[in-house]
Amino acid sequence: MDEGTKFQITVYDKKDKVSGIMDYVVKEVSENSATMFYEMHDEKGKMITSSEYGITCTNDGITIDFSSMMSPELLGQYEEMEVEMTGTDLLYPNNLNVGQSLPDADVLMTVKMPPLNMKMNMNFFNRKVEGNESITTPAGTFDCYVITYDSEAKMGIKMTSSNKLWLSEGYGMVKQETYNKKGALIGKSILTAFEK
């Protein structure tokens, strides 16, 4: 990824209505790492939150900072508070193969609200490369690997979902769909602009 690369992910709800727009820019690229900065706006253009996270390239593949796994809407709710995060980074190997299993990832977020601490745990597991597919979005046509995984969020109650991700070399996420445990689509994200 080159410094200054910009891209946009549009988030849709289960009724296919825009629920948010995320604008990303690649900042501070070094030999084997980069910082991603993003701003999230609601469907009316009002800024909800902004944040950044790191990406590292190694011989094993690309690792994405575990903090990126927390939803921007959630982070926006706690931006005035002291938040601690620990976890395991998300790894995408350099050479993906259909049928390949990918390592699990997790993040634990602790929000300090004296006298209490609130904890939220997010796990990504059963990550697997299911196939290859070419898909077209407003940003263009992309050859993608299709990756499926399950996610589990725990904050008092446990919420599980299954996900399907279309990942393209040199571009990253092109599309993602999220399903509830009954298999109904509850949301999707699509790459709607990309500018190098």
Q: Model-derived features: where do they sit?
A:
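Acidic, serine/threonine-rich low-complexity disordered tracts
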Residues: 1-51, 57, 109-196
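An acidic-aromatic
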Residues: 41-98, 103-105
